[in-house]
Amino acid sequence: MVNNFSQAEAVELCYKNVNESCIKTPYSPGPRSILYAVLGFGAVLAAFGNLLVMIAILHFKQLHTPTNFLIASLACADFLVGVTVMPFSTVRSVESCWYFGDSYCKFHTCFDTSFCFASLFHLCCISVDRYIAVTDPLTYPTKFTVSVSGICIVLSWFFSVTYSFSIFYTGANEEGIEELVVALTCVGGCQAPLNQNWVLLCFLLFFIPNVAMVFIYSKIFLVAKHQARKIESTASQAQSSSESYKERVAKRERKAAKTLGIAMAAFLVSWLPYLVDAVIDAYMNFITPPYVYEILVWCVYYNSAMNPLIYAFFYQWFGKAIKLIVSGKVLRTDSSTTNLFSEEVETD
């Protein structure tokens, strides 16, 4: 009798004295602090890193290009993940409980899905933009205009938000797995299981665009390699020691394609394990251990923090823009016309 009582006392609940409360599986103080630091850092990096990207592109007139507007909108999606999703997921992952109410649980799930699919669709648009820029640079300015970029942005957001909210607010994700949903439902939990059909659809919505992007970037790099060889073969015949304007533009476009290709690859590597696991779970009665699932989810979340780091490493203009923003010199009246592509930018 005493033994049974001690076992009952050992079980922690998310909400004490509440019927049907979820069971809490707390970490010891050391690992708990480390998890909060690591996961919280990801949220801060995603929020502030992508905020810097948006400010840089929207403030500096030299960056007002169709490609950069797509990048700014992509950064907006990742910024929203860092603000509306990751902080709450941090608490849920560390405390193993959801303390933010049922209403925001549903919003959180919709935000999570919407912003992540928005990132995917933006990357698809960017890959098409880079393909045209590298393979047909002469007509690129007339083919992929700011208006075309705007249409891509609107459609990416519209389909992402419509798809996500229609799934979770109609209950379509729960059809056929009602017993599982009842078994998982408890006070302090926030699960949104998907049935097999929706999991398969989500996987295809991820897989098909990514296969297309891999194909497009492969074509881009083949063309870029051919262009580089052509420039090298004609370099000795050049009358001027300095590069021609056309060559400089071609180099810039190839570098942009390479950088954005790396961003696409990072997205693929971050997402693929999670989606493969989701498909396996849907067809094998959700066999994934909770800690494995948490690791896969946070690999996806951390992708939202990676793009600013990629830009900072490969884009010289982004580093210069950050210096101007952080130093406060961006507040000067003429700062928006700063030449970020010159060898040296006046920052004094």
Curated annotation (Swiss-Prot):
InterPro entries: GPCR_Rhodpsn, GPCR_Rhodpsn_7TM, TAAR, TAAR_fam
Stretch list, region Extracellular Loop 2 (ECL2): 174-187
Signal peptide: none
GO terms for biological process, alphabetical: adenylate cyclase-activating G protein-coupled receptor signaling pathway; G protein-coupled receptor signaling pathway; sensory perception of smell
Cytoplasmic side: 59-68, 129-148, 219-256, 315-348
Extracellular side: 1-33, 91-105, 171-196, 281-293
Gene3D superfamilies, per the entry: Rhodopsin 7-helix transmembrane proteins (1.20.1070.10)
Glycosylation sites: 4, 19
Binding site for spermidine: 112-113
Membrane topology (UniProt): Multi-pass membrane protein
GO cellular component: plasma membrane
Entry's localization field: Cell membrane
Segments crossing the lipid bilayer: 34-58, 69-90, 106-128, 149-170, 197-218, 257-280, 294-314
Residue pairs linked by disulfide bridges in the UniProt entry: 22-186, 105-190
Keyword tags: Cell membrane, Disulfide bond, G-protein coupled receptor, Glycoprotein, Membrane, Receptor, Transducer, Transmembrane, Transmembrane helix
UniProt GO molecular function: G protein-coupled receptor activity; trace-amine receptor activity
Primary subcellular site in the record, as a coarse category: membrane
Keyword match DNA-binding: no
PANTHER family documented for this protein: HISTAMINE RECEPTOR-RELATED G-PROTEIN COUPLED RECEPTOR, TRACE AMINE-ASSOCIATED RECEPTOR 9
Family, similarity comment: Belongs to the G-protein coupled receptor 1 family.
Function description: Olfactory receptor specific for trace amines, such as N,N-dimethylcyclohexylamine (DMCHA) and beta-phenylethylamine (beta-PEA). In contrast to mouse and rat orthologs, not activated by triethylamine, cadaverine (CAD) or spermidine. Trace amine compounds are enriched in animal body fluids and act on trace amine-associated receptors (TAARs) to elicit both intraspecific and interspecific innate behaviors. Trace amine-binding causes a conformation change that triggers signaling via G(s)-class of G alpha proteins (GNAL or GNAS).
Domain writeup: In addition to the well known disulfide bond common to G-protein coupled receptor 1 family, trace amine-associated receptors (TAARs) contain an unique disulfide bond (Cys-22-Cys-186) connecting the N-terminus to the extracellular Loop 2 (ECL2), which is required for agonist-induced receptor activation.
Name of the protein in its database record: Trace amine-associated receptor 9
Organism taxonomic ancestry: Eukaryota, Metazoa, Chordata, Craniata, Vertebrata
Gene name of the encoded protein: TAAR9
